[in-house]
Structures are given as structure tokens and as C-alpha cells.
């Protein structure tokens, strides 16, 4: 699956999910979020592998970007062409991303924007093309685990013949409820 250009502009904080209905989101189309003037914060999901030409270009209020843990192709010029408004970039990959020199097209003030990288990777980023231009490279702890999962145990009812019921039965009989035999009177 991929994120494509929509007619309703994205606003505020946008999180591109890793999956939608169990399918991985692997690509952000060129111009997908182009000129989204009200987009302020962007989090790119961990399954995204490709971001197209000017995917987030001309989003003049974009100030905070979080890049995925996985390796992603950022080889298109002007991908973050955002009028020098980006103030923070959070890189979650322990290996510095390979990016095209024109990725920001002058949209990042390297002296003001803070580049956050995983603990222990500051030197690697400082030695990498494009990333070495940042004056402020700060290490931060990066969580790569799944957190805040709410599991709601649903009540499951079946007849003795194995037919699944959508609710607790109101007709007397013997049923299976969450794997146990239950008598309903």
C-alpha cells in the first residue's frame, strides 16, 4: 500500500502507519503531502521504504519530522522542500540513511535544525553525507518495540454444533462460551 495525493490537506500531526488493515504501507507517492500548509508534524511508519519526489514539499509549516527505523529510500530531490521551517528531525535508524544531496533543497537551516539520532550513532551520522551538515546532532533513546497495545477480550459464544453466535444466547440450552460448556436456562 502507499500514501497517495489527496484533496483534503493533511493537518497538525500526521502519522503514516506501518500497516493498514494488516497490509504494510511501503511507499509515499510523489507529491502525496505537497503544499499541506497546516501540516506541522510528520511521523513516517516503519514499513515505508520509498518516499517520492516532493512527497512533503511546500508544506511550509512542517517543523518536526520523524523518520522510520527501517532503511528507506530518500533519493528524490526536494522531498522536504519546506521553506526552512523544519526545526527537528528524529532519525530512528541505527544506520544513517543514504540521502540525496537535494533532499532538503535549502529547506533546512542546518545551524538551527536539531538532528536527533539513536544513542551510539552520533558519529556515524556526523560522518555521513548530508547529515554531516547539521550543527546540532543529539543522541536520544529510540524505542523500537511495540507499546500501548490494548487487548479487549471478546465474549465468544458457539452452539454445540460449532456455529458462532453474535451475542449471548437467550434460548435455553447448552452452549460453548470462551471454550467452556455453559448451560443457559
Predicted regions located by residue number:
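Structural signature of tandem-repeat unit edges
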Residues: 9-27, 36-50, 59-74, 83-98, ...
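A structural signal for leucine-rich repeat
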Residues: 79-82, 102-108, 128-129
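Short, small/polar residue-rich loop motifs at catalytic or cofactor-binding pockets
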Residues: 21-22, 150-153, 168-170
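A recurrent domain-boundary module in secreted/ectodomain proteins
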Residues: 127-143
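Consensus positions within tandem repeat domains that build extended binding/scaffold surfaces
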Residues: 29-32, 52-57, 76-79, 103
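GGW-centered surface loops in extracellular recognition modules
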Residues: 1-9
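Residue-level detector of functionally pivotal "anchor" positions at catalytic/ligand-binding pockets or at interdomain
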Residues: 138-161
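C-terminal tail/sorting-segment detector
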Residues: 174-185
Amino acid at each position: 500500500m502507499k500514501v497517495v495525493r489527496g484533496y483534503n490537506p493533511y493537518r497538525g500531526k500526521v502519522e503514516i502507519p506501518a500497516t493498514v488493515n494488516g497490509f504494510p504501507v511501503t511507499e509515499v507517492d510523489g507529491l502525496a503531502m505537497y503544499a499541506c500548509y497546516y501540516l506541522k508534524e510528520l511521523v513516517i511508519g516503519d514499513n515505508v521504504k520509498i518516499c517520492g519526489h516532493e512527497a512533503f514539499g511546500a508544506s511550509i509549516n512542517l517543523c518536526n519530522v520523524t523518520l522510520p527505523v527501517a532503511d528507506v529510500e530518500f533519493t528524490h530531490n526536494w522531498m522536504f522542500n519546506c521553506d526552512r521551517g523544519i526545526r527537528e528531525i528524529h532519525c530512528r535508524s541505527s544506520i544513517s540513511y543514504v540521502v540525496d544531496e537535494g533532499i532538503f533543497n535549502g529547506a533546512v537551516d542546518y545551524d538551527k535544525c536539531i538532528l536527533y539520532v539513536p544513542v551510539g550513532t552520533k558519529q556515524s551520522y556526523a560522518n555521513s553525507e548530508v547529515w554531516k551538515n547539521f550543527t546540532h546532532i543529539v543522541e536520544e533513546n529510540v524505542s523500537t518495540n511495540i507499546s500501548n497495545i490494548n487487548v479487549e477480550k471478546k465474549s465468544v459464544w458457539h452452539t454445540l454444533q460449532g456455529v458462532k453466535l453474535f451475542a449471548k444466547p437467550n434460548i435455553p440450552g447448552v452452549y460453548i462460551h470462551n471454550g467452556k460448556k455453559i448451560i443457559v436456562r
